[in-house]
């Protein structure tokens, strides 16, 4: 059975210990005792076939602490994990002691109260800088491969959003609950894995907090080498498909008969004759005179040719006549 180390941090009195007790014992503590250091251990069942990307896990969260994905659906195909929960003190007196439990942590939970803006502001002003300085969150595979910190942001005391006394108190202080828009912007800007809300008093969303934390902890992102290999294979397949289609097009072009682009070969005979008749423009008067001149010139050339032929013929002489007469026989 794989063991998951989960460390919970956040301001004092935001409900970290109450969250852990509510999850492990199904009860809500009524007395507040500041935590110095405590450790809880339990077994959690996670359905097989985790999401292929952390974004899919986050999309299953309705932002109010209930997952609509595989965590809430009944399934017999589950895998057991041992989750070790490390509770820490949020007071400044323990700033030097607290980082001793950070090494080899699989997932961090940074908690804040949805009704206290000061605890929400400390997420980026105190807790994230402390983790960067005293832990190895920037050396995890999630950060090196995805640019995401192994951190789940948790809003506690979600039941106070509908509490009239808390609403009145916030109005008197000219304040309000931490809005969902503020939370989404912080998660995106800081590179957290996701966000969820819960209430230890009503146990709403408590179980889903740790199921989601385990999913993030066991998620194994694709390495850059695997991505490069997959992209290379995809490019090769695309190139091969393109070349095959190109060769096919060339063969089809070679098999097609050659067509002349001239107008005479593309137009039908009837339409070609009509087009020629339409383009046959009647000659002008000047053109008629030129035609008559050409005809007379042609006749004159024929007469001249006949005269020349007659001149070349030899005329008969007197001697020729005498020779004919001398042929007569005298009896």
UniProtKB/Swiss-Prot annotation:
Lipid attachment, kind S-geranylgeranyl cysteine: 328
Pfam family, one: Ras
UniProt keyword list: GTP-binding, Isopeptide bond, Lipoprotein, Membrane, Methylation, Mitochondrion, Nucleotide-binding, Phosphoprotein, Prenylation, Ubl conjugation
Subunit architecture: Interacts with RGD2.
Biological source species: Saccharomyces cerevisiae (strain ATCC 204508 / S288c)
Cross-link (Glycyl lysine isopeptide (Lys-Gly) (interchain with G-Cter in ubiquitin)): 276
Effect of residue 91 to H: Cells sensitive to calcofluor, caffeine and Congo red
Compositional bias (Low complexity): 66-75
GO annotation terms (biological process): actin filament organization; apoptotic process; cellular response to oxidative stress; cortical cytoskeleton organization; establishment or maintenance of cell polarity; regulation of actin cytoskeleton organization; regulation of cell shape; signal transduction
Biased composition (Basic and acidic residues): 287-297
Keyword Nucleotide-binding belongs to the record: yes
Topology term for the membrane: Lipid-anchor
Phosphoserine: modified positions: 223, 228
Phenotype of null mutants: Leads to resistance to oxidants such as H(2)O(2). Impairs apoptotic phenotype after H(2)O(2) treatment. Leads to hyper-resistance to cell wall stress agents such as calcofluor white and Congo red.
Phosphothreonine found at: 232, 244
UniProt region (Disordered), positions on chain: 51-76, 239-331
Function: Small GTPase that negatively regulates a MAP kinase branch, downstream of SLT2, of the PKC1-mediated signal transduction pathway. With its specific guanine nucleotide exchange factor (GEF), the heterodimeric complex DCK1/LMO1, relocates to mitochondria upon oxidative stress and triggers cell death. The DCK1/LMO1/RHO5 signaling module that mediates mitochondrial turnover under nitrogen starvation conditions via mitophagy. The DCK1/LMO1/RHO5 signaling module also plays a role in cell wall integrity signaling.
Family that this chain belongs to: Belongs to the small GTPase superfamily. Rho family.
Stored PANTHER family: RHO FAMILY GTPASE
Name of the protein in question: GTP-binding protein RHO5
Biological classification of the source: Eukaryota, Fungi, Dikarya, Ascomycota, Saccharomycotina
Statement: the UniProt record of this protein carries the keyword Phosphoprotein: yes
CDD domains on file: Rho
Biased segments, Basic residues type: 308-331
List of residues that carry Cysteine methyl ester: 328
